[in-house]
Amino acid sequence: LLSMMAARAGAGRVVACEENPAIADSARRIVAANGYADRIRVVTGNSTELELESDLEGHADVIVSEIVSNNLLAEGVLTTLADAASRLLAPGGQMIPMGGAVMVALANWGAATRTHMAEVAGFDLDGFNALAQVPRNVAVSDATLTLHSTPAALLSFDFTGKAAREPHRGAATLVSDGTPVSGIVQWIRLDLDAEASYENRPGPDAKSHWGAQFYPFDAPLDLAAGTELRVVGVHDGHQLLVWREDRCPRSELPSS
């Protein structure tokens, strides 16, 4: 899809890279059906395996990608784009997006308890809730998910240079609006270029195939308006963990 958009916008030569052979084969047929077979070539494989001359016929003037996940990192975006920027992009070329950020805010998610274990057949199974997956995925359009602080960038990344050293930490100070909160919600921002950006910030009118991630507190916090709460995040290049500073997790990195 991105390749056909590039060709429609005027690109004279486009190389699309798709690792899954079945999807790549279907993509070739779709490209031909839309009349772009003369300008778009679909290469099967990972972009890190592309040969500069045989696959690309030289450095690319523009590299457009969409390989980010709900936490921005899970698809190996940092190492993949660092390789593309350093090896495949022409001097002065443009990476789209050129960067991204992990965004966070204090939040309430009313529907979070709907999947909690409670009483079954007269037995109290509440203890199983300690095994619930964290973070929990939530649709950004979920009407029961409400933000109660000014959003902040917890981790920011430059996709035009070398990948950040791992593990990488970041911190942000969130200011409460005075509403009791039950956790931290995380979403993503993509900086397409120096002027335009995309953000799947949660809200009732939000539309995105990317979801948000919710990190619940052990118990709701009743904070006065203006109260500052410091949030910490750490990643290993693929996984992300977020917590409030006074509640350090058992491990600073998620287990694989």
Label each residue range with its predicted role.
Residues 2-256:
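Class I SAM-binding transferase module
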